[in-house]
Amino acid sequence: MSGLGTMVLTLLLLVFMVTSHQDGGKKQATQRNAVNIRRRKSITQRTTDEKCNEYCEERDRNCCGKANGEPRCARMCFG
């Protein structure tokens, strides 16, 4: 009986360890996805000032921010 009890306890411990390890992987993946979404938002949501907007509107383009202090104008802004 004691051998059987030891085997049952060992199996329960193994099952607990495996399921907790799998849950940790899901949590880690969720956190990684959240970080990726935050990075994407920060890339696409750039702040532009009025001078850049006016400068680019004269050229029928969108202001994509500034590079070396100069406005960057393009039809579509990418990162």
Swiss-Prot record:
The GO cellular component terms are: extracellular region
- The cysteines covalently paired via disulfide bonds are 52-64, 56-73, 63-77
Q: Signal peptide location in the record?
A: 1-20
Q: Which Pfam families match?
A: Conotoxin
Alphabetized, the UniProt keywords read: Amidation, Disulfide bond, Knottin, Neurotoxin, Secreted, Signal, Toxin
**Cross-referenced InterPro entries:** Conotoxin
Residue ranges spanning the membrane: these are none
Which residues are processed away as propeptide to yield the mature protein? 21-46
Tissue distribution of the protein? Expressed by the venom duct.
* Subcellular compartments: Secreted
What is written about domains in the entry's comments?
A: The presence of a 'disulfide through disulfide knot' structurally defines this protein as a knottin. The cysteine framework is VI/VII (C-C-CC-C-C).
> According to its UniProt record, which protein family does this protein belong to?
Belongs to the conotoxin O3 superfamily.
What is this protein's record name?
Conotoxin LiCr173
